[in-house]
Amino acid sequence: MMSVKIKRSVYADMFGPTTGDKVRLADTDLIIEVEKDFTVYGEEVKFGGGKVIRDGMGQSQVTNKQGAADTVITNALIVDHWGIVKADVAIKDGMISAIGKAGNPDIQPGVTIIIGPGTDVIAGEGKILTAGGFDSHIHFICPQQIEHALMSGVTSMLGGGTGPSHGTFATTCTPGPWHMGRMIQSFDAFPVNLGISGKGNASRPAPLVEMIKGGACALKLHEDWGTTPAAIDNCLSVADDYDIQVMIHTDTLNESGFVEDTIKAFKGRTIHAFHTEGAGGGHAPDIIKVAGLKNVLPSSTNPTRPFTRNTIDEHLDMLMVCHHLDPSIAEDLAFAESRIRKETIAAEDILHDLGALSMMSSDSQAMGRLGEVIIRTWQTADKMKKQRGSLPQDKGKDNDNFRVKRYIAKYTINPAIAHGVSKLIGSVEKGKLADLVLWSPAFFGVKPDCIVKGGTIVAAPMGDPNASIPTPQPVHYQPMFGAFGKARTASSVVFTSKAAITGGLARKLGIEKKLYAVQNTRGRISKKSMIHNDATPNIEVDPETYEVRADGELLTCAPAEVLPMAQRYFMY
């Protein structure tokens, strides 16, 4: 057989970039380079008129029962914490079944994924494929949040609340088994993975045990309910007994103790610290110190991401609304102002870039924008590239691969590890739920091309349904067939505790969604478990100036004047 040489640009136009090719992410300065291509050159598969995936060519006679894939995403550029590679991705029974080379093994060499008559194709040529995002800080204020999050590329959400109650406006806590049952029953209506956090503020175990058995997959300690050392100690003790995670929003006013007292109450036990910078709440001015502890899994909420010229101005009004404060009361105003510090917000940028802050989340409608978790993660990465240059791991490589792996881990695999669901979601890996998002590189992180949930397309931009083709304007993000009927419950799960499942929660509530027990959330995970984000510097905060130092180095940076992934993408 004769080989034919073609230009890289021509090859990329036909099959997408290959090993050594570089791709810019949206309009950022972040450049990725393809590390490996799983294809066999000359044997690539592609769907369409006159293309490869036809009967007797790239499509075999193998049935699905015999091993053919249900769906193949062809020639996609996978961007994940473990690598940046070009491959075909197979989906079977709603799970990722293989990453490799698709085709017809009867006539093609190197085939690891079989295409048969029962195989559908999603064209990934020239596209980027990522795992669906996981937002682990949700105030369940309104159900419309879920669609907005899904359309941004988030396929899993964890948080608390009961709807637009004042307790939910301020805290991510679902109080008590009755409210928990109603929330979990409502989850059958949504095509995403969902989990409920119960209220963790109690000084005795019984109320917390009741909530865990009632369906909580985590417990949330929030200062508005009283995050005292006694409540912290009790909550962590119960969590250890039932293998669920604890999230904490610490005591901004330092009423029941200072950050040192809270750390002492941890007793070295694993805990997920929300908005660790402090603008979202927590010991003023030095809660950020916990980001350097080995047992703390720290995350940010996105209003402070990244630090810009507008960040400080917008926060005060947000805070007054979210925490039911009155600007005419001096004490309420002082409470709000104590949380907004430009010095710690600037340091937050750098701690993310150093891998000391491990996760990104939203704090939806309660000082956070749930549709912008992914955008603001990459805006932070871009700002740090512009201000700090290449990371040491990327020096001399003419790409930003390590930085990209570090940042994508913040909203995919790391929250999945922290909350005990990384065996099911969080990355593009064989054996995991096929929760996948396809992006055009120019719109990466901003507007997805297609969102796959449990192997089924659940959302995509769609043109006029009455048009002769799918693309005429107006183009809107719309729910697809996977978001309706029993398909939405078959392709997603509810995260809960093993105790709830053992106690027959699904039967008691009459729900259709499968329950998935969180696991390995306690002593066997620590900051070292946070992939690419496990740094534990010694962090100090000057109580007078609020300056932040990590291992003695001052952490400061200028606010951004202009951001990528912003107005040019949302003009209409």
From Swiss-Prot:
The active site is at H323 (proton donor). It is found in: Cytoplasm. Its EC number is 3.5.1.5. CDD domains: Urease_alpha (cd00375). It is an enzyme of class 3 (hydrolase). Pfam families: Amidohydro_1, Urease_alpha. Carboxylation allows a single lysine to coordinate two nickel ions. The modification N6-carboxylysine is found at K220. One of its GO terms (molecular function) is urease activity. PROSITE patterns: UREASE_1 (PS01120), UREASE_2 (PS00145), UREASE_3 (PS51368). It comes from the Bacteria. Ni(2+) 2 binds at K220, H249, H275. Pathway: Nitrogen metabolism; urea degradation; CO(2) and NH(3) from urea (urease route): step 1/1. GO terms for cellular component: cytoplasm. Substrate binds at H222. GO terms for biological process: urea catabolic process. Binds 2 nickel ions per subunit. Ni(2+) 1 binds at H137, H139, K220, D363. It catalyses: urea + 2 H2O + H(+) = hydrogencarbonate + 2 NH4(+). Its cofactor is Ni cation. Residues 132-572 form the Urease domain. Belongs to the metallo-dependent hydrolases superfamily. Urease alpha subunit family. Heterotrimer of UreA (gamma), UreB (beta) and UreC (alpha) subunits. Three heterotrimers associate to form the active enzyme. This is Urease subunit alpha.
